[in-house]
Amino acid sequence: MSMMNRNIGFLSRTLKTSVPKRAGLLSFRAYSNEAKVNWLEEVQAEEEHAKRSSEFWKKVTYYIGGPALILASANAYYIYCKHQEHAKHVEDTDPGYSFENLRFKKYPWGDGSKTLFWNDKVNHLKKDDE
């Protein structure tokens, strides 16, 4: 008797895990055809709205963004040219502060007096009068 009870227990546990809980339920939902039609109309309306919206933003990008980008670039170039013209007339005055270019040990590259990211157009090498 106990062996039979164990087999029935094993069988019931196996069936519980292998058979889905809702196996006997209907595989479709019963709803009205009118609700389905309304839902399809809403989906189509959303698709149409998305299409019109994307076309609108494409037009904004091409007809407003493009010319704005061209005008902004032309303005930036004009300002750059004015700045370059002004920069030609400015004298290069280097006050020569005492704390600039202090070297206690030579760098292991070049002549040893210039840093790794040295730029001759911007940086000025102070000559010692010793």
From Swiss-Prot:
Q: Does the keyword Transmembrane helix apply?
A: yes
UniProt protein name: Cytochrome c oxidase subunit 13, mitochondrial
- Pathway field: Energy metabolism; oxidative phosphorylation
Transit peptide, from-to: 1-31
Q: How does it assemble?
A: Component of the cytochrome c oxidase (complex IV, CIV), a multisubunit enzyme composed of a catalytic core of 3 subunits and several supernumerary subunits. The complex exists as a monomer or a dimer and forms supercomplexes (SCs) in the inner mitochondrial membrane with ubiquinol-cytochrome c oxidoreductase (cytochrome b-c1 complex, complex III, CIII).
**Which family does the entry's similarity section mention?**
Belongs to the cytochrome c oxidase subunit 6A family.
Q: Which residues lie on this side of the membrane: Mitochondrial matrix?
A: 32-61
Q: Could you give one GO CC term from the UniProt record?
A: mitochondrion
Instruction: Supply the source organism for this entry.
Output: Schizosaccharomyces pombe (strain 972 / ATCC 24843)
Instruction: Specify whether Cytoplasm is a keyword of the entry.
Output: no
Task: Report the locations given in the UniProt record.
Answer: Mitochondrion inner membrane
Signal peptide (from-to): none
